[in-house]
Regions:
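Short, well-ordered alpha-helix to beta-strand connector turns
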Residues: 4, 26, 207, 225-227, ...
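Mid-domain catalytic core of redox enzymes
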Residues: 215-330
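C-terminal catalytic lobe of FAD-dependent flavoproteins
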Residues: 310-367
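Dinucleotide-binding Rossmann-like beta1-alpha1 core, especially the glycine-rich loop
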Residues: 48-123
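Active-site/ligand-binding neighborhood in enzyme catalytic cores
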Residues: 89-93, 99-228, 232, 239
Length: 367
């Protein structure tokens, strides 16, 4: 008999939910992570009394009541509502695109005036079949919004101009004809009081966790420990990149502590011009309505990913989609291994969807 029922590779949200549920069912679990901390990319660390989102802003939002009730077992959530603002050469615009944005941009006051303005610009551009992201954006929201709020930002995000990006990246752009700055139209939204790390710690309460353990480097020995493996690392790395590497976009953060109590007045400010090298600045204290004497900010830079870098976003184009489909065949045929999570499924996953997926899989596993 092996020492554990499950070896769970990755102490992020997927691994933690799986481990919590399996332990509840009296399964013996070992969770390992190659990083020196739990919670994966939702890891928060305390600096100057402020919970800093080390791997970028994470705002919990869901329409799924069961998932909301689930996370509330492990943390109390505050009422934070994501309302980012865009800074274009010192002009401030509300996001997502709504009546506040249109009023600032054109001085329009009513939804009818805003619709007319967008229609007029779409008609003037004369685009019927958008060939690239630029044409797609203009055909959806007109020239002004595109030039000031989309062009520079999106170009920085993807590392290439909008004319070279496929139109399908923005099938739709959320445009609201109400004065509503709530970015996520979700029933439930907030940030766990005390940060995400404390929440994941509670999920892993009573579960054995070993940090700084590289599964792929010690796979042969580690596999002997458990009957089943739950793998949440990169799926292509698991198979030694034998079909080629999947592409990601990476992000680089410059984080600093400032001797001021309020740097930008909002948690998230996007810099939408092409000249500013970073895409946005996060001021972490505003996620929890902090009143600390100092503040911590993170400048976020989009970066081309190369193997060895931290993978953030899968590049969901046709080429990578086809390659992942081939890896998925290998994953499905791998005996005794469950592949899950953002990297294991090569998928852009909101947190609530990760929890849904993990609960679904562990439920079937324990049935």
């Amino acid at each position: 008999m092996k020492q554990y029922d499950y070896l769970i590779v990755g102490a992020g949200l997927y691994g933690a939910v799986f481990a919590h549920e399996a332990k509840k069912a009296d399964k013996r679990c070992l969770v390992i992570d190659k990083r020196g901390h739990i919670a994966g990319n939702i890891y928060t660390e305390e600096v100057e009394g402020i919970n800093v989102h080390r791997y970028g802003a994470h705002i919990f939002h869901t329409n799924n009541k069961a998932v909301w009730q689930y996370v509330n077992q492990f943390a109390e959530f505050n009422r934070y509502t994501n309302s980012p603002v865009a800074n274009y050469h010192g002009e401030i615009y509300n996001l997502p695109f709504n009546m506040n944005t249109f009023n600032r941009m054109w001085g329009v006051v009513t939804p009818a005036e805003a619709r007319a303005k967008i229609e007029q610009q779409r008609a003037e551009a004369g685009i019927t079949e958008p060939k690239n992201l630029e044409e797609q954006a203009i055909s959806l929201v007109g020239t002004d919004i595109y030039e000031k709020l989309i062009k520079g930002y999106t170009g920085k995000q993807w590392g290439r101009p909008c004319t070279e990006l496929p139109a399908f990246i923005i099938k739709r752009l959320p445009v609201r004809f109400t004065y509503d700055d709530n970015y996520f139209n979700a029933l439930y939204q907030g940030i766990p009081c005390g940060g995400y790390t404390a929440m994941v710690e509670k999920m892993l309460d009573g579960v054995e966790v070993r940090l700084g353990v590289d599964y792929l480097a010690g796979k042969a020995e580690l596999d002997k420990l458990a009957d089943r493996v739950v793998y949440t690392g990169p799926v292509d790395a698991y198979f030694g990149y034998k079909l080629g590497a999947l592409q990601y976009r990476s992000v680089r953060f410059e984080t600093e502590t400032l001797d001021t109590d309020n740097y930008q007045g909002n948690a998230v400010v996007n810099y939408t011009d092409a000249e500013t090298p970073y895409t946005r600045i996060i001021e972490h204290k505003h996620f929890e309505f902090g009143t600390q004497p100092k503040t911590v900010i993170s400048r976020e830079y989009s970066a081309e990913w190369k193997p060895g870098d931290e993978p953030y976003y899968p590049v969901n184009d046709e080429k990578n989609g086809a390659l992942y489909a081939e890896y998925k065949k290998l994953a499905d045929a791998e005996p005794g291994v469950i592949f899950g999570g953002r990297l294991g499924e090569y998928k852009y996953y909101d947190m609530d969807k990760v929890i849904e997926a993990a609960l679904d899989v562990v439920g079937r596993e324990l049935a």
